Regions:
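ATP-dependent small-molecule kinase phosphotransfer cores
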Residues: 2-17, 58-136, 141-142
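Phosphate-binding P-loop
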Residues: 25-32
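Short glycine-/polar-rich loops that comprise or flank the Walker A/P-loop
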Residues: 32, 61-63, 154-159, 209-211
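Short hydrophobic/aromatic beta-strand immediately N-terminal to the Walker A/P-loop
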Residues: 34-36, 137
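Glycine-rich phosphate-binding P-loop
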Residues: 36-54
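Zinc-dependent deaminase catalytic domain
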Residues: 46, 68, 80-120, 198, ...
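Conserved phosphate-donor/acceptor-positioning beta-strand/loop module used by diverse small-molecule
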Residues: 139-142, 150-178
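Small-molecule kinase domains that catalyze NTP-dependent phosphoryl transfer to phosphate-bearing small molecules
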Residues: 176-227
């Protein structure tokens, strides 16, 4: 199915998703896989794609690449007349945002990738390619809703690889290999990380959804071995077991599942000498220590939460409420005719990053306090967390 207009993409989406769903049901667990790559701008994804292709060839897999920039955005909105690489990359970001906004669909680019995969699949069927399986590498994914849609369509056949490369390396790659001045390269990196618009680039929010993480830090042999290990796991090597770091992160993720916070769910664990010392989640602390757990109400014969306990029971987030009150307090001290502009500025300001006024204890703090309650020393321990610590948690971790 070849899509050439955004209107066609929206119109054909139901049939396109139906076809993909049927194929998912009819193929074996590893007869077809779709690999999405998520990374910040400046990461050398060409090198990663080549390594994935080389490794999959050892398993007799045919590997095809779907580039969102050329196979979806350019197909729908044209290549554009760019004079340099900065204009090209910035222009592609803008076009991707426009597609999401015009379609009112944040996974529109994922639908385009699915359409391209269907097209490649049909071509392989015509050519009768004799391979054990087929893999499609999507380069690259920039919005969480794209991930959700691809997982909905392909199920366990979709895998998301998060590629980490430190900012200095990415900046150098953009300057050296793309010929972009440092100031403009820095603008691209900042824009790619997290735009204000809901239809924009949200690499930071997408990255943590990955199934596997690869570190592109210049150690080529380690990167090759990490990719080998990933595919050994996928293809059922029974002797590949988790490292302790992986196990601890799994425990942190599991701990996050017990959070009922209204903003997001975070988990953390403290570990020492290859043993888990404590777990923590971001939720409202309970009198006497620890967090609220659901309890069994014998009278109603059902599990319930304590009245006035967690925020969702109360029906509001005290931190969000306090941030609104701060903004309203500032606006009330500004002349009425100027308030509209100031309100927009304040709503997009760093005030929205304030976390001090929430009732919840953060996951990292709860993990530390759990050790304190049971007289376990945290000296020389390691903390594993599903997100980066805030400034308050960072101070407590260091102390």
């Amino acid at each position: 199915m070849k899509i050439t207009k955004i209107t066609e993409l929206n119109k054909e989406a139901p049939q396109l998703l139906k076809n993909s769903g049927e194929d998912k049901q009819s193929t074996g667990p590893l007869a077809e896989m779709v690999i999405g790559l998520v990374s910040s701008v400046g990461t050398d994804l060409e090198a990663i794609t080549k390594k994935i292709r080389d490794r999959l060839s050892l398993y007799k897999f045919e590997c095809s690449e779907v580039r969102i920039s050329s196979d979806v955005i350019a197909e729908l909105l044209g290549n554009g007349d760019y004079t340099d690489n900065y204009q090209r990359i910035d222009g592609l970001m803008t076009k991707g945002n426009k597609l999401r906004e015009d379609s009112e669909c944040n996974y529109i680019l994922a639908l385009g990738a699915i359409a391209k995969i269907n097209e490649i699949r049909a071509k392989h069927a015509r050519l009768q390619i004799n391979k054990k399986g087929i893999a499609y590498v999507i380069n690259s994914i920039k919005h969480p809703e794209e991930v959700y849609k691809l997982r909905e369509v392909y199920g366990s056949g979709f895998l998301l690889f998060g590629i980490f490369s430190d900012e200095s390396r990415r900046l150098d790659n953009i300057i050296r290999n793309k010929g972009i001045p440092e100031d403009k390269a820095a603008l691209l990196i900042a824009r790619d990380e997290d735009e204000e618009s809901g239809h924009g680039q949200h690499t930071r929010d997408t990255f943590h959804l990955a199934d596997f993480f690869l570190n592109q830090d210049g150690r080529d042999d380690k990167l090759n071995n990490d990719i080998k290990r990933v595919f050994d796991l996928l293809f059922g090597n029974p002797f590949i077991t988790p490292t302790f770091d992986e196990y601890a992160m799994y425990m942190a993720f599991s701990s996050a599942l017990r959070s009922a916070d209204l903003s997001r769910q975070v988990g953390a664990v403290l570990a020492k000498n290859y043993a888990i010392m404590s777990t923590g989640a971001n939720d409202v602390p309970k009198s006497g220590g620890g967090l609220y757990w659901p309890y069994f109400n014998a009278e109603n014969e059902s599990y319930e939460d304590y009245p006035e306990g967690r925020d969702y029971v109360r029906g509001f987030d005290s931190n969000a409420k306090q941030k609104r009150e701060i903004i309203h307090d500032i606006l009330n001290q500004i002349p009425r005719k100027s308030r509209d502009n100031f309100e927009r500025i304040l709503n997009n300001s760093l005030i929205q990053d304030i976390t001090e006024y929430g009732r919840v204890v953060h996951a990292e703090m709860e993990a530390i306090l759990a050790c304190a309650r049971t007289n376990i020393s945290t000296q020389d321990a390691y903390i594993y967390c599903t997100t980066f610590p805030c400034h308050n948690c960072a101070k407590h971790i260091i102390a």
